[in-house]
A protein has these predicted regions:
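Short, conserved acidic/polar surface loops in the N-terminal third of protein domains
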Residues: 93-100, 132-135, 148, 186-187, ...
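An internal, acidic/charged active-site-proximal segment
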Residues: 139-211
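Short, glycine/acidic-rich beta->alpha junctions
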Residues: 32, 64, 113, 178-181, ...
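Short, charged/polar micro-motifs that form catalytic or ligand-binding hotspots
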Residues: 26-30, 41, 107-108, 175-179
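Active-site-proximal, Lys/Arg-enriched surface segment
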Residues: 27, 55-132, 140
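Electropositive, glycine- and tryptophan-enriched low-complexity nucleic-acid-binding patches
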Residues: 39, 49-53, 107-170
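Gly/serine-rich nucleotide phosphate-binding loop at the start of the catalytic core
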Residues: 1-53, 63
């Protein structure tokens, strides 16, 4: 059984994007070597510009991923107990023409380097060690947009806005590393009614003002 049309229908994906994704996703798995608009065109028969036009628009990946998780829960394939995890991933990239290129922290090298950064929020099951990415955004460099913390907060708010009730019931805990241990993150998690598990910096101020 092909589950993709079912997911596209449940996620209420618009017809033009549904038609595109029905072709794109099986093709993505079948193409050998480098993946780009030209290789998609070569193996599909569609014009290269068609792929570029669709990729310039926002595709509903988060809706598909979350719909898949809800479908697995409904089918009792996984236990509906999750934690939210959030982290950023660095991608080395040289050149000057790539969109979003900037200086980002590379934890493997222990320093900032030129490249790209993707911020990911995922659902991780308590049992079975399954992980489902549900929101991925490219972090913009400082010269283009606000600082990284503001972008991370915007991403988290955008996820909670349409799915607040479901996430609060099935994923009441957010886990992130020390770079997210800032007051705005604690305030947001408190406002959403979820617990925030993180690692504080060595110079964190834990003093409670006397009232």
């Amino acid at each position: 059984m092909n589950i993709l049309p079912v997911l596209l229908s449940l996620a209420a994906v618009p017809a033009h994007q549904s038609h595109f994704l029905n072709l794109l996703l099986p093709l993505w798995l079948a193409i050998p070597g480098r993946i780009n608009a030209r290789s998609f065109s070569r193996y599909s028969g569609w014009n290269e510009r068609t792929f570029r036009r669709h990729f310039q628009a926002a595709l509903p990946w988060h809706a598909l991923h979350l719909t898949l998780v809800k479908l697995l829960v409904r089918c009792k394939a996984i236990v509906p107990r999750f934690i939210l995890v959030m982290d950023a991933s660095f991608i080395p990239k040289s050149g000057t023409k790539t969109s979003g290129l900037g200086a980002f922290w590379n934890s493997c090298a222990g320093r900032s380097e030129t490249g790209l950064e993707l911020s990911c929020i995922a659902l991780m099951t308590w049992f079975g060690h399954h992980c489902f990415p549900i929101s991925i955004r490219q972090t913009r460099p400082k010269k283009e947009k606000a600082d990284r913390l503001t972008q991370y907060l915007d991403q988290l708010r955008a996820l909670f806005r349409p799915h607040r009730a479901w996430l609060k019931e099935f994923a009441p805990i957010l886990v992130a590393d020390g770079q997210y241990a800032k007051k705005p993150f604690f305030d947001l998690c408190r406002a959403e009614g979820i617990a925030f598990v993180t690692k504080l910096a060595v110079n964190a101020n834990l003093l409670i003002p006397f009232v």
